[in-house]
Amino acid sequence: LFSKLSERLGRVREKWGIQALFSERSRNGISWESLEEVLIAGDVGVTMTERVIDTLRAKVSVSGPDVDPAKLLSVVLRDMLLEVKGTGEPIRFSSAPTAVLLVGVNGSGKTTTAAKLSWNLGREGRKTILAAADTFRAGAVEQLRIWGERAGARVVSHPSKGDPGAVVFDAIKATEARGCDCLIVDTAGRLHNRDNLMEEMARVSGIIDKNCAGWVRESFLVIDAVSGQNGLKQVEAFGKVVPLTGLVMTKYDHTAKGGVILSAGHELGVPVRYIGLGEGMEDLVLFHPGEFVEALIADVRKEV
């Protein structure tokens, strides 16, 4: 996993240039202003950046003169990510089935995430049902069918333009009838400032609540890593409508910033659970803060 992270985070690492920044320290001391600029430009956000720098300053001040601030920074970032309860935890299971509701804006990667989660669960020996509740986007149902076939999961769908709630209801019954372990619901993408669409999403969530008594509930917001700090607005808006239990950060291999992953959970209390590193089924992985930070900063793995 570390080698894959290191490879896929190359663009982010190059853009941030943490090692190059700290390599100047022996001649000029640490440029806190430059570090602040790097973190903010990398979409970490002002609040999180200030906390990172304050914490790092404190650690540097009590360390010896030979301390490597890059290594200390990796520890600071890792510890901050781990402070958010649930960070990097897999989908939860009990004796009853688990229902996973995927929500997010258009183009965030919900459909492929649904299939990749199903594929991962299949490797653990769990049976899943995929609910094609995106009944509005042209080709959405067929896309999920194709991805579901690749993942080895059954897809429950209705004709295009049908009622998403009815799809979810039928998928719940299919999950129970077939003795499956998990139902993953793919919903239509919606802008977080469109009240009518958000109300529809709340209705779908309510159908799950009403018909899945005793089930484990997960609600994941799927965020495109390229969205930057706009992702925080999405977390806040969707979280008002659906009780979010985690974030899935997709397309992390396509961004040259990526700092939103450091601030999303911390500022709003929703943990990052999974991260997408590519197009393959195997490229959706659990988010491991330690390995992520090591790959982001580079050359610090052995001593963190």
Where are these regions (language model features)?
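Non-catalytic terminal/linker segments enriched in charged/polar, low-complexity residues
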Residues: 1-102, 117-119, 123-130, 150, ...
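P-loop/Walker A NTP-binding module and the surrounding RecA-like catalytic core of P-loop NTPases
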Residues: 78, 82-304
